[in-house]
């Protein structure tokens, strides 16, 4: 049974109660549902729809949209506001007048549901951000993996120690050893703890004779499939909504770009991850490593056995490993087949093809 109303909420513990409020052309819709689930959908700008959901009692905020353009349009809300209902574990976001009306309704719900919410009404609704929808989304970190990053074997332990103590780290070895996962997870940890200002992820687009020109869309959309392994880890560690906020060009806390875009840049106060480094040439590797500035950690991952460079072209990863072998300021970690942690089948496959 679903009960709908306008301007007030029906106290029905068995039904889903919905309150709808209109503020000019900007609509804020609150969906009230019996605990443990509560969600809020807001229509903020030009009909753009975003969903903020939570699972009580943990404050797991989720940001979704019917299309990416919906979320982007919502994020650009001018004169917007964001409220956090701590006890309901939900965010309400949109035009300021509409959010104020939603706030009143949330207070009413908290009063009626005193059995579950015993704190004072004033403590239940905290205004996070006014006149700035972008920052509000940045504050809305949804559920994310906060478990400690632990090593599953000795090689991973050396890798973690190298990332924590060195400015330049090379990691090479077979597939499934956790090179990409650990580097992305540590980068997310550094960003959350504000040890760095941004994360930069890059990789060469050369892979198995494929070309970005065959993929649809602009350069960002063409590059997206290549970024997916790192993206999945960052979303898991940062949270989906905070990740969307970080990817905004004007925010720039997380940047993804093809390797060719690194020329002429300087990396400072950042964690830089170069993935699939076996597919860069020696000259390209030199260009990349000379981009290093202050307070930067550069992690270079690759697998020499999966090199897609033309025959006779030396891999920049192999060349760099030889040049920095004796350098105490550089961390070098080599993973073997026995260090594969992806699955038993993956480990057997590595041995079968060795």
Swiss-Prot record:
Keywords linked to the UniProt accession: ATP-binding, Cytoplasm, Nucleotide-binding, Stress response
Example of a GO MF term: ATP binding
First-listed, main subcellular location of the protein, grouped into a coarse class: cytoplasm
Gene Ontology terms: cellular component: cytosol
Superkingdom of the source species: Bacteria
Record's signal peptide: none
Subcellular localization(s) per the UniProt record: Cytoplasm
Expression induction: By phosphate starvation.
Pfam family, one: PhoH
Residues engaged in binding ATP: 173-180
NCBIfam families: PRK10536.1
Family of the protein in this entry: Belongs to the PhoH family.
Record protein name field: Protein PhoH
Annotated gene: phoH
């Amino acid at each position: 049974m679903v009960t709908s109303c306008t301007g007030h909420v029906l106290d029905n513990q068995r039904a889903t109660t919905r309150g709808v409020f209109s503020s000019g052309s900007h609509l804020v819709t609150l969906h009230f549902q019996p605990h443990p689930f509560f969600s809020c959908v807001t229509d903020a700008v030009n009909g753009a729809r975003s969903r903020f959901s939570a699972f009580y009692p943990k404050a797991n905020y989720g940001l979704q949209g019917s299309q990416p353009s919906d979320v982007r349009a919502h994020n650009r809300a001018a004169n917007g506001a964001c409220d956090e209902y701590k006890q309901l574990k939900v965010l309400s976001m949109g035009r300021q007048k509409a959010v104020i009306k939603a706030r009143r309704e949330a207070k009413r719900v908290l009063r009626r549901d005193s059995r579950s919410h015993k704190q004072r009404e004033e403590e239940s609704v905290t205004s996070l951000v006014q006149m700035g929808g972008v920052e509000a989304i940045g504050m809305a970190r949804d559920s994310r993996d906060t478990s400690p990053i632990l090593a599953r074997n000795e090689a991973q332990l050396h890798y973690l120690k190298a990332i924590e103590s060195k400015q330049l780290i090379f990691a090479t070895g077979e597939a499934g050893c956790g090179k990409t996962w650990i580097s992305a997870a540590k980068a997310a940890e550094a960003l959350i703890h504000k040890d760095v200002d941004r994360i930069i992820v890059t990789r060469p687009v050369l892979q198995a004779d494929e070309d970005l020109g065959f993929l649809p869309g602009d350069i960002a959309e063409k590059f997206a499939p290549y970024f997916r392994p790192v993206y999945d880890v960052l979303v898991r560690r940062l949270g989906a909504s905070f990740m969307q906020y970080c990817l905004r060009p004007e925010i720039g806390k997380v940047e993804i770009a093809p390797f060719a875009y690194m020329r002429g840049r300087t990396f400072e106060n950042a964690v830089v991850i170069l993935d699939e480094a076996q597919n860069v040439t020696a000259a390209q590797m030199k260009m990349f490593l000379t981009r290093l500035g202050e307070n930067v950690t550069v992690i270079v991952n690759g697998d020499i056995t999966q090199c897609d460079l033309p025959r006779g072209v030396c891999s920049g990863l192999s060349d760099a490993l030889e040049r920095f072998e004796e350098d105490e300021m550089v961390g070098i970690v080599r993973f073997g087949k026995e260090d594969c942690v992806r699955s038993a089948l993956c480990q057997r496959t590595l041995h079968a093809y060795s």
